[in-house]
């Protein structure tokens, strides 16, 4: 049994990255062995070697359409569970699991696997199912990512709904707004708030899997973070589309794509919409993000200057993910060792970013992560509008665009 005193630094956030305990354990064991205080500093190479990305996922979606409307949606997700790695010495920690609504008794669904897969669109019949890939859970152990919920689920949902809109011959903006109507469970909560621990399906569409958040313990309720429900998200979408010039005539091989997101399983969601203008070279598949238009309703904005900087930074992070960021595994280890192999966005690729903060006067919520979630689907939808190529995986490389153009 170790007796170790940990000196904490009271500074900064890490978008979830500081919840990993590996460095703490290593320092604790070293301090115990040498009998002296130990400060552990990783090299960049060791940091890459011990990184934990989000889990690889595979998605299968089906849509039921009738009279020009989306009336049913089924979303199956195969992925690794995130919870086991944080449950030291156990298979799962109960605080990482949520109830399976098939029987409402057993906590056997990893909440992080389906975050973002439900949404604020009104679809009368909506089912989400998560399938645990045990091999993936342990081969590619997952951790936090700067997105709030899972950006890959939001990428899938927004890309799929865009495909449905085109299949129905409807304008993607009008189609989204028609479903962000605040009906049913998507109305949000009343101004009076609700009791701590209230299941999120209180204010969401019917789910195959229930999404109670938080599951246990005493929590201070957020009185008005979800007031307005889908209508606040629709307002963000109108603003973002307007700032991007949705519907205007564009140069050849240039398109605008839309996307919205809000962490539906959280008690304090932030409402965000994004529009991306993209130009594609049809000969090479290379594309440039010309402009990102982001509209965000964070309730009450306490510091507009810092909030704008956070929104811009998260949007760049989203652009970096869709353009080039990728981790490869070889013989169980991450192949990339430093930034000469792992390629985040470079200054030459930075688009113009136009931010609109919507002051709704409601309870303040977070701004550091949400805008990253709308960039990738907006870019993917813009590429389709530019050259008719639908890419269904990330990152969206020039090779992937060319391949999609051949299939189109």
Where are these regions (language model features)?
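Cofactor-binding beta-sheet edge motifs in enzyme active sites
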Residues: 1-408
């Amino acid at each position: 049994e170790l007796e170790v005193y940990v000196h904490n630094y009271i500074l900064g956030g890490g978008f979830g990255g500081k919840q990993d305990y590996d460095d703490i354990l290593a320092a604790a064991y070293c301090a115990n062995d040498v009998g002296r205080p130990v400060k552990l500093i990783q090299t960049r190479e060791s940091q890459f070697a011990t990184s934990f990305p989000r889990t690889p996922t595979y998605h299968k979606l089906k849509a039921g359409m009738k009279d020009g409307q989306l009336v049913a949606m089924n979303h199956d997700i195969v992925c690794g569970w995130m919870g086991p790695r944080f449950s030291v010495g156990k298979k799962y920690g109960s605080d990482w699991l949520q109830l399976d609504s098939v029987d409402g008794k057993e906590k056997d669904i990893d909440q992080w696997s389906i975050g973002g897969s439900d949404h604020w669109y009104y679809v009368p019949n909506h089912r989400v199912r998560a399938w645990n890939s045990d091999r993936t859970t342990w081969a590619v152990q997952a951790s936090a990512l700067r997105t709030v919920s899972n950006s890959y689920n939001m990428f899938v949902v927004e890309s799929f709904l865009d495909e449905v809109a085109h299949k129905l011959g409807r304008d993607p903006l009008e189609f989204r707004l028609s479903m962000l109507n605040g009906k049913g469970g998507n109305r949000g909560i009343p101004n009076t708030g609700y009791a701590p621990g209230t299941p999120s399906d209180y204010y969401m569409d019917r789910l195959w899997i229930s999404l109670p958040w938080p599951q246990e313990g005493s929590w201070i309720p957020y009185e008005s973070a979800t007031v307005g429900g889908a209508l606040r998200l629709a307002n963000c979408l109108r603003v973002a589309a307007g700032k991007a010039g949705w519907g205007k005539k564009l140069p050849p091989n240039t398109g605008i794509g839309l996307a919205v997101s809000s962490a539906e399983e959280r008690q304090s969601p932030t409402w965000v919409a994004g529009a991306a203008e993209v130009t594609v070279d049809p000969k090479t598949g290379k594309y440039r993000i010309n402009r990102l238009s982001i509209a965000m309703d964070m309730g009450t904005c306490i510091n507009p200057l810092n909030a704008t900087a956070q929104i811009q930074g998260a949007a760049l992070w989203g652009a970096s993910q869709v353009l080039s960021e990728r981790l490869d595994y070889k013989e169980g280890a991450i192949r990339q060792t430093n930034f000469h192999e792992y390629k985040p966005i470079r200054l030459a690729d930075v688009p113009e970013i136009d931010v609109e903060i919507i002051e709704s006067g409601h309870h303040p919520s977070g701004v550091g992560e949400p805008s990253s979630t709308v960039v990738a689907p907006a870019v993917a939808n813009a590429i389709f509008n530019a050259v008719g190529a639908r890419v269904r995986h990330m990152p969206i490389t020039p090779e992937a665009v060319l391949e999609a153009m051949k299939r189109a």
